[in-house]
């Protein structure tokens, strides 16, 4: 009952907070030359990663929401099109982390809550995924491991 007695200004101030605080969102770093091999070896992940970079540049809430929906779909496609060389527990675990932060961002955005910390965590998860792919490549010097599946 005490919650109902709060002034309206206190209740509405929480819902008027900006959903995305762009000045506190890091941009997704670009792939360096050691990571470009992802483009040819796992096109579905590369497509997901490239579109993810636009999250920090969405000009409106509507476009941000549409981009989140698109990324959830692209992430699912990337997991279903996982190449044989990427069938590693470390890759699957990193993709689950990315999936979790992507869905947390979508949920908070739908609830009109700020999402800047989730976006930063999502970008960190994608960066960690990139590093895991490079480590996997470096640990396996067998050139046949990274030949595109046919």
Located regions from the model:
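C-terminal motif of bacterial Sec signal peptides marking the signal peptidase cleavage site
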Residues: 1-3
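Immediate post-signal-peptide N-terminus of mature secreted/exported proteins
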Residues: 6-66
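C-terminal amphipathic alpha-helix
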Residues: 18-39, 104-150
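Extended amphipathic alpha-helical scaffold segments
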Residues: 49, 72-75, 99-102
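Short helix-adjacent coil turns
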Residues: 58-62, 86, 112-113, 117
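Short, charged, amphipathic alpha-helical segments
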Residues: 65-72, 88-97, 116-124
């Amino acid at each position: 009952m005490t919650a109902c007695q709060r002034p309206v200004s206190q209740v509405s101030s929480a819902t008027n907070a900006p959903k995305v605080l762009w000045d506190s969102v890091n941009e997704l770093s670009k792939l360096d030359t050691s990571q470009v091999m992802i483009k040819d070896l796992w096109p579905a992940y590369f497509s997901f990663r490239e579109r993810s970079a636009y999250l920090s540049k969405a000009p409106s809430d509507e476009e941000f929401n549409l981009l989140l929906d698109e990324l959830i779909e692209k992430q699912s496609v990337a997991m279903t099109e996982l190449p044989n060389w990427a069938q590693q527990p470390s890759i699957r675990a990193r993709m689950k982390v990315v999936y979790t932060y992507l869905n947390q961002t979508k949920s908070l955005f739908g609830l009109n809550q700020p999402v800047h910390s989730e976006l930063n965590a999502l970008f960190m998860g994608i960066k960690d995924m990139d590093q895991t792919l490079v480590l996997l490549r470096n640990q396996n010097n067998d050139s046949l491991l990274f030949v595109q599946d046919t």
